Amino acid sequence: MKITKNILKAEFIKRPNRFQAYVKINEKIEMVHVPNTGRCKEILIPGSTVILREENNENRKTRYDLIAGYKGDMLISIDSQIPNKVVYEALMNFKIEILKEYTNIKREKTFGKSRFDFKLEKENGEVYYLEVKGVTLENDGLTMFPDAPTERGTKHILELIDVKNKGMGAGVLFLIQLNGVKKFTPNHKMDKNFGEALRLAKEKGVDILAYDCLVEESSISLNNPVSIEI
């Protein structure tokens, strides 16, 4: 997907809280919004190059969103709104192999008391619920989720097991917001409960998927499946 708004580079200075950061643009210090509540501490390093998206919204306190950062030569998208958009585009273009037969794609749908990112249906009425998780944590080709404890994420995984137990399809797709990685694994050290929930989900028949992305400064799209170690 193309990012149609104005894109520019800046130098990262600091991040005083989850939602705000300070960057340097043409020698001027500017406060920007960070659309990711994760820690991203391996990416947002003082002096590193980051990518900003200009919002031009008079009702905002900040003019820019900090949407990506360079880790060496590797560009990593950190915008938490991007994964669902990328996966939606991929579903509409039948790029996810095991989900190609699902032609009716609905976003943000509930099942019982649970809300999932996607509800998919085949022409024969078969239903599949899909949850998407964005991944930004990478170390020497190994990617992990989460980068901070996530009770909400664990709850989603357990809810997918419930969907599967009721006879419907269920899956979680980890969208790795960078390119050229080797493997994905749950971050057991950061959140043991999430890792255990994911292992149980796999045992119960929930599909566990991981894809990396082609990331450029003004675009991002689904790329290739990534091997998973649970």
UniProtKB/Swiss-Prot annotation:
GO MF terms, alphabetically ordered: DNA binding
Top-rank lineage group of the source organism: Bacteria
Database matches in InterPro entries: SfsA, SfsA_C, SfsA_N
Query: Known Gene3D superfamilies for this protein?
Result: 2.40.50.580, 3.40.1350.60
Query: Which Pfam families does the record cross-reference, listed alphabetically?
Result: SfsA (PF03749), SfsA_N (PF17746)
Q: Which residues form the signal peptide?
A: none
PANTHER family hit by this protein: SUGAR FERMENTATION STIMULATION PROTEIN A
Family statement = Belongs to the SfsA family.
What is the protein's name according to its record? Sugar fermentation stimulation protein homolog
Organism per entry: Clostridium botulinum (strain Kyoto / Type A2)
